[in-house]
Structure formats: C-alpha cells, structure tokens
C-alpha cells in the first residue's frame, strides 16, 4: 500500500438536521474507536434509524479518506447520491464495474466450446472510475469512494500510474510533438471531431483535450517549444471557463506501463510461453500447445506494435513484475495507509467478497488447462478474503443483522442504533400454530385492507406462492406473487402497483432483495417459520420482520408448531429493542408515527416500469413527448433518486438490447439521456 502524504482537505458535512435519538452516542462510540485504533467495529442499526447519516458524521470527524463498500450497483448508486448530498464540497467518487455487458472468457470442455470475452464499456462509469483513482492519488484527504466488489479486482500499479502523470505549467519548456507522443502513450486518442474524455485534437499550436476523468476540456497553446497558456473550457459550447497556471494530465486507462517495463514483461511472457509449451507437448497436448502459441504470439505482436492488446490484464503479473501467486494491485492500493472502510449491509457484502476468488479461479483454470491462457493469467484475479482483511486498516461494519463474522472481528462489541427519528418501534411478532393458518391469515389481511394497508406473505416454495396467490384472488383479494422467475421489468411493474395501491397482498419466497421498505406494509406473515435453514435462519427472519418496521401498526406473524432457536433469537432480540425504543419515547414524549410518502415519491421508486408503460403507449401512438409526462415526477425527486432511476433504466436498456428489442432499447436510451441532462442541472 502506498504511503501518501496528505495535502489537506477537510470534510464538511452539510445537513438540514442534526443527530437525534441514539445517533449522537453511536457517532461518538464509532469515532472514538477509529481514533483509538480499533481495527473492526460493528454498527447495528435498525431499518430507518439513519445509519448513513451516522456514518457520514464519523467520516467528517475522523477526517480520513474512506471506502464505502456495497454489495450491488443499485445500492451503491443510492449511497453515492446520499453521500454527495451530505458532502457537496468534498470528493465523493463512484467505483463500480464499468461494463454495461460482460461475458467473461470461458471454455466448456464437454462441448468443446470456447466462449470469447464479450463486453460493452460504459464510458461514463469508466470516467467516474478514473476520477476516483485520480482523487486518491492527488493526496487530498477529503475523498470518499463508494464501491461495489469491483474494488478487489485487479488494477494497474498506482506507482506506474503516478509515474505517467504529465504536469503542465504555463511558461515551461515542452516540445509540442513530444507532448503529443506522451498523450498517445497515456492512451489518449486523436479525434478532431468528437472531443470527449480520453480524446484530443490538434489545431496548429493549439491542443485541446479532455482528461479521462473529467467532463471539462483543457486548451494548451504553444509558442514555439514553450507553453504559452492553459485554459479550461466547455467542450460542448466552447465557452472559456478559466485560465490555469498549471494542469495535470492523468492516464486515460487504468492499466498503463512505460515502454521499458513492457519490454521486460514481453520477455517474461516469452519465457513462460516456452516453458508451458514444453510441458503441454510432454503431455502430448499438441492441440492445446498450438492454440496457446498462436494466441500468445498474436498478443505479443499487438503489444509490440501498439503497446496494448485485448486482454492485456491476463499478463498483469508480468507487467507489474509480481511473483507467481502474489496478489494483484487493486483500488485499495490507491488509498493511503490510514484510510477507513465502511462495509454497508455487511452480512451480505462480506460473504460476497469471500466468494469472488473461487469462481474466478475455477473458470480460468479450465482456460489454462486447455491452452487458451498462460498459467500467469490465474494471477489476474480478485483478492482472496484473507488478503482483503489484511489490507483494510480499520473497518466499520454496518448492518441491521450483523453476522457472526463481524461480531467475532469486533470482539463481540457492537455499537447499537435502535432509535428511529419517527419514534417507530420494531414490529410486534406473534406466533400462531400451522393448523388453520390460512383462515387466520386471511382474517388478518382483511383487517389490514380495511385500513388501506398492505400485507406481505412469505412461503417456502414458488409453487406455494402461486397457489396461495390464486386462492387469494379467488376470494376477491387484489393479490400478486413475486419470485425469481419473474422478469425484472415485470417485477418492477408489480412493485409499482403495490406502492400505488393496485395490489393489497404480495406473496413471495424471498422478498429481502426487492427493497420493499414500504410504509403501507403493516403486516408480514411468514409461513413455515419453524423450518430452520435458508430464509428461515435468524438473520433472514429479522430482515423479513423489518419490512413492517415503517408502519406504526406493523405486525409480524410467525406460523409454526414449534419455536426454533432462530425464532427464539429473533423474538428475544425484537422484544429487547422494543423495550429500549418504548422507554426512549416515554422519556422524551415522542409519539410514534408512520413514514408518509407522497404519490410522486412512491412512483419515483418504480421508474423503470413507468418507462416501459410510456414505451408501450408510444408504440400505440398515444404519446409523442415522454419528457412531458416525466417532468412532474422529476420535480419532486432528489438528485440521488434520479441517479438511482438512471442505474435501473441502464440495466433494462441492456437487457432489451440483448433480446434484440432495439426499439425499446433506443427508447430507454433517450429517456436516460434526458435524465442525465436533468442530473447536470440539479444541485449536488
């Protein structure tokens, strides 16, 4: 890890409200722990208690560069938007996989089928990734990077990256042609028409370029072999924004290496190839040997001519000069030694990090054995979990249900945040016998419907959810079922109908990942709660029960003939939390109240389904200007809400393209472009 000298920059938290409830004590405990040098801490925060706000206060007080880890892109986008709002004057960056579509290279021996790597890079996300690494290498203190598990995958060496940075100063001696050669070496492309990130144009003694991580362009004017002036301007309008005394040009790609290192690497690749060919031929694997030689020599020729080749990351070990088995460089290496790591939803994120290495290793081993890659390709990999734990200096795990691993790492000490600003208590839990469960459940659901409230019912199998849904519909209830076989767009449409009031009961198997934090949900029923195992363990039961935690009348029903250890743990923990929450409310005269969302706020969260409906209407000729219909909803949305909408719609656009429904993909693309323009107009 690099030892970066901090060059200043203080975090400045901005919020219209201050810490309330047990947030002040949680902030103090976590801050004291960081300053004391505690390596691992755990924040147990119930749903709706403001965990992100608490973490933001800790970051501001310890004033250290921070990595915030999330287990999926959508939640990462949401966290990014929230933290941008809390820290508008600081560097809040975004680092996720930059692929809109990614099919990894693979080989299926049983079918003798090779699947070539296929991908589509999202230029905007690539720019944001470059901006994140640039901010970290600038040495500034006030940097927050929100990342998915992409942070444990291989990157170029930070030392190599820094060595390639070009510093420009007004009045410095610099040959124009030499500067152009440096730009090409940094993977900038000449394009006299489209001036976009990573491209430059030349007009006499004037060179315009857009750094790979920026949206604004630089204009460098030469007078002979001297830099006469440096200006920043808008590449779209051409408007000059300011005059600069100096500028730094960062590489336009994550993987860079100077020509000398590349020559050494190519020699090492040649040597490994010779050894591997001898081994394959000794095993009489002549087809594999021929295949490997042809592919590797082609890559070497491309590196010799262009300084780059497709799949160059598979040779990263040689380019970086690492030893066999040595871990790759990754985003963590770009942080200074004393950075802070916040793991959001740690009970899901940490197991995800643990599983990345095994899947990657299995796929690449097959490629190596059959002559598609050199053995060194195995070292282009994500970090092992043990390596990740060694690299993170201080960690705060955040979860409503921390697992045994977080508790063990934290020495059993947990910082609790159980008080909600709304005064809401954890929902009450009742246990009922299995005999007569459907009639009992039906009566409770009808009680909720009479109050305009929603119900969630969880079954153990998809078949059970469909049958129960059909039974409810037969009795006149507005019911729907939800499980993994339902397509993403249809799932979003179902959630939209639930939030808009068209559905009264939602039946499903695993409703944890759907983001069903709805204030209208006042009843959660769990069938077969005593079937210990997947989705009926203590963590899952607690997460499911939390779906009723945003309504003052929230109630959870466990249908079971016995109380399992997991059920007992959840019942005892819920009662403990309710007692603490009730005592706090009585002491401070707080009356619990349900969270209230306007119709616009409800519909914002299902924007993808709304876009599908507008697309359908457009095909029928019912609509010409989709932006007019969106405008009213957008006016009520925050910047982070719109960014989350774009992330969801990007995923649906890619799915439409994969299914060759290019008309739908183009329609979604147009809406995404409109939303991105709206984001630029909104305040940070």
Swiss-Prot record:
Residues 437-603 form the Helicase C-terminal domain. InterPro entries: Helicase/UvrB_N, Helicase_ATP-bd, Helicase_C-like, P-loop_NTPase, UVR_dom, UVR_dom_sf, UvrB, UvrB_inter. It comes from the Bacteria. It is found in: Cytoplasm. Its main location: cytoplasm. Keywords: ATP-binding, Cytoplasm, DNA damage, DNA excision, DNA repair, Excision nuclease, Nucleotide-binding, SOS response. The keyword DNA repair applies. Residues 643-678 form the UVR domain. ATP binds at residues 45-52. GO terms for cellular component: cytoplasm; excinuclease repair complex. The keyword rRNA-binding does not apply. GO terms for biological process: nucleotide-excision repair; SOS response. Gene3D superfamilies: P-loop containing nucleotide triphosphate hydrolases (3.40.50.300), UVR domain (4.10.860.10). GO terms for molecular function: ATP binding; ATP hydrolysis activity; DNA binding; excinuclease ABC activity. Pfam families: Helicase_C (PF00271), ResIII (PF04851), UVR (PF02151), UvrB (PF12344), UvrB_inter (PF17757). Residues 32-420 form the Helicase ATP-binding domain. The UvrABC repair system catalyzes the recognition and processing of DNA lesions. A damage recognition complex composed of 2 UvrA and 2 UvrB subunits scans DNA for abnormalities. Upon binding of the UvrA(2)B(2) complex to a putative damaged site, the DNA wraps around one UvrB monomer. DNA wrap is dependent on ATP binding by UvrB and probably causes local melting of the DNA helix, facilitating insertion of UvrB beta-hairpin between the DNA strands. Then UvrB probes one DNA strand for the presence of a lesion. NCBIfam families: PRK05298.1, uvrb. Belongs to the UvrB family. Forms a heterotetramer with UvrA during the search for lesions. Interacts with UvrC in an incision complex. The beta-hairpin motif is involved in DNA binding. PANTHER family: UVRABC SYSTEM PROTEIN B. This is UvrABC system protein B.
